[in-house]
Amino acid sequence: AAMCGVKPGHTMAEVHGEIRKEIEEIELPEGYTFFWDAQYKDQGEAMQAIAKFFPLAFLMLIVILVALFGNFRQPIIILCILPLSLIGVAVGMLLTGFDFGFFPIAGWLGLLGMIIKNVIVLLDEINIQRRNGIAPYTAIIEATVSRTRPVLMAATTTILGMVPLLFDIAFGGMAATIIFGLTFATLLTLFVTPALYAMFYKIKSNSKYA
């Protein structure tokens, strides 16, 4: 077996891409075989598992959200927010220079859970306000204001907790995904979610907040 480490400033995928062709062109003696093992093999198997089970997990997520809210409009609002988080992730990858490999993908999947939690909390607060007889537009404003502090506190503690990992060779990409993705997703939660709610429910501003 042959093993090597990766110097700081380089990723495993980058190094593997540079040496793979030369290594695989080596003619082996009769009876000898060659295969990639260790971290490369483990990540490949993990990626296959994600590709296999992600559609089922996504379908279950939709079913749970519909059952939770009792309608389709609010789950659709949540699903509209999730892809937009990739904007923050892309910015993070470009600024830090990490590849969007296995660990960043794992970080993004974890990030989706945080986003869903924050959006559910905000939508639930809007629903509570409306059930209490508050005008729809007023309910959106007051719910967003009341949920801003908890959402920001949760996002800030998570982001600060990821900062030390940002400088790690193995987990730096995952940390960058969560830090930049969650920063952008928090803004989506507080600004885009209320706007989508008003659009889906055709709510217009009233004189108090116009």
Segment roles from a protein language model:
Residues 60-148, 152-171, 180-184, 188-191:
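Hydrophobic transmembrane alpha-helices and their membrane-interface caps
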Residues 44, 160, 197:
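Nucleotide phosphate-binding site architecture
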Residues 1-57, 66, 137-139:
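Extracytoplasmic/periplasmic membrane-proximal domains and adjacent transmembrane bundles
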Residues 195-210:
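Interfacial helix-loop-helix hairpins and adjacent transmembrane helices
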Residues 14, 178, 190-194, 198:
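Short, charged alpha-helical segments
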Residues 20-27, 55, 64, 96, ...:
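Non-catalytic alpha-helical coupling and interface elements of nucleotide-dependent molecular machines
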